[in-house]
Amino acid sequence: MSFNHKTIEELHDLLVAKEISATELTQKTLEDIKSREEAVGSFITVSEEAALKQAAAIDAKGIDADNLMSGIPLAVKDNISTKGILTTAASKMLHNYEPIFDATSVANAYAKDMIVIGKTNMDEFAMGGSTETSYFKKTKNAWDHTKVPGGSSGGSATAVASGQVRLSLGSDTGGSIRQPAAFNGVVGLKPTYGTVSRYGLIAFGSSLDQIGPFAPTVKENAQLLNVIASSDVKDATSAPVRIADYTSKIGRDIKGMKIALPKEYLGEGIDPEIKETVLAAAKQFEALGATVEEVSLPHSKYGVAVYYIIASSEASSNLQRFDGIRYGFRADDAKNLDEIYVNTRSQGFGDEVKRRIMLGTFSLSSGYYDAYFKKAGQVRTLIIQDFDKVFADYDLILGPTTPTVAFGLDTLNHDPVAMYLADLLTIPVNLAGLPGISIPAGFVDGLPVGLQLIGPKYAEETIYQAAAAFEAVTDYHKQQPIIFGGDK
């Protein structure tokens, strides 16, 4: 018997009643992972021995009835540090790296007696939108194995969507949680910048990165955010604000809520059927008592260009530490120090990572800094101001998560610009440091469509409230791919 159809609350009740043990739940989860892994390829590492050892220890002391997450398995994206478990960032550069410390988000999960079941596949160093740049494998979409799962947190999304695990962690720099959540029909939240500590996250774009949760439902997503969100003195960008319970508004009605629908989010490049899906969702919110009105975010069209200058510049700086000297891969054909640097980085990084390092180095160079990096920072401010103006009058922003549904494997990985444009609708949220969620909102050609809800900073509770209200009157989250046991 598989437990992957049970909610976290249902699993908790079974554990407290001793109808199952943490060890049995872990064993069943490992079986679910193994039976589906060949089809989807969600994991780089499955930490079977460590997980069973941890489960046995939890059983020995007993399940805490007041701790919802006690004994619950968790999959973790492979750019989040896990002590004693390989953390590769899906790169040859770190293919054998085993950290000696846990990321704060992982430590918080351990503190709640969650069981880290394994590390999920991703785009190398989180640079990509399809999980095709991984050094190890290409993950496949849970709904159609000829399609991409999205990225960069593709493995974390497919692990939940395919029923391998109930909960997982990802990271979002320009849409890397929300886009794969949309492509796989699950709930993925990018929290407000600073809500979840970045300590132990292998950095890509330090002013953009944020760890966040994946789950099958809105409430379970909020329950996982309750675990990982915390202020942290180890992270200089950690926010002091701490909401006690992100589920507190779930179940409340949304009568009187004002929701903005930016005309730019339904314009050029958006699949007409996705536009129809979003407009239908807007009518559903109106039926629930909310007001939905068209607004403008005029500078959002510059988001992709701004993002790839800023993110690549930050990446070129962050990735300087991978030099073949201290840890990770070192080229064995080097004869001197210069060759160690050059050969290690040439051989250790994949093409997309090298492309972004070069772009970032160029943008930061003395002759071009003002024209590119400085200018990008100025336009970023304009994008932030656009959001501020809208949120002065509205509670949330509504729109599609992605311009299209999941595209085919090996169709965009040789066209960087087309791949970058797939993040058109998610990038502005990271540039502004805002919270954003993707929830299932329909299907086009049998593939899931994600609906994005964006809020002002620290408005996760309101986002969850609206998302849960929509979820309660639709059944998209209940529909599952064949690999999970569904009929699609």
Swiss-Prot record:
The active site is at residues 77, 152, 176. Gene3D superfamilies: Amidase signature (AS) domain. Coiled coil: none annotated. GO terms for cellular component: glutamyl-tRNA(Gln) amidotransferase complex. It catalyses: L-glutamyl-tRNA(Gln) + L-glutamine + ATP + H2O = L-glutaminyl-tRNA(Gln) + L-glutamate + ADP + phosphate + H(+). Keywords: ATP-binding, Ligase, Nucleotide-binding, Protein biosynthesis. Pfam families: Amidase. GO terms for biological process: translation. GO terms for molecular function: ATP binding; glutaminyl-tRNA synthase (glutamine-hydrolyzing) activity. Its EC number is 6.3.5.7. Heterotrimer of A, B and C subunits. Belongs to the amidase family. GatA subfamily. Allows the formation of correctly charged Gln-tRNA(Gln) through the transamidation of misacylated Glu-tRNA(Gln) in organisms which lack glutaminyl-tRNA synthetase. The reaction takes place in the presence of glutamine and ATP through an activated gamma-phospho-Glu-tRNA(Gln). This is Glutamyl-tRNA(Gln) amidotransferase subunit A. It comes from Streptococcus pyogenes serotype M5 (strain Manfredo). The lineage of its organism: Bacteria, Bacillati, Bacillota, Bacilli, Lactobacillales.
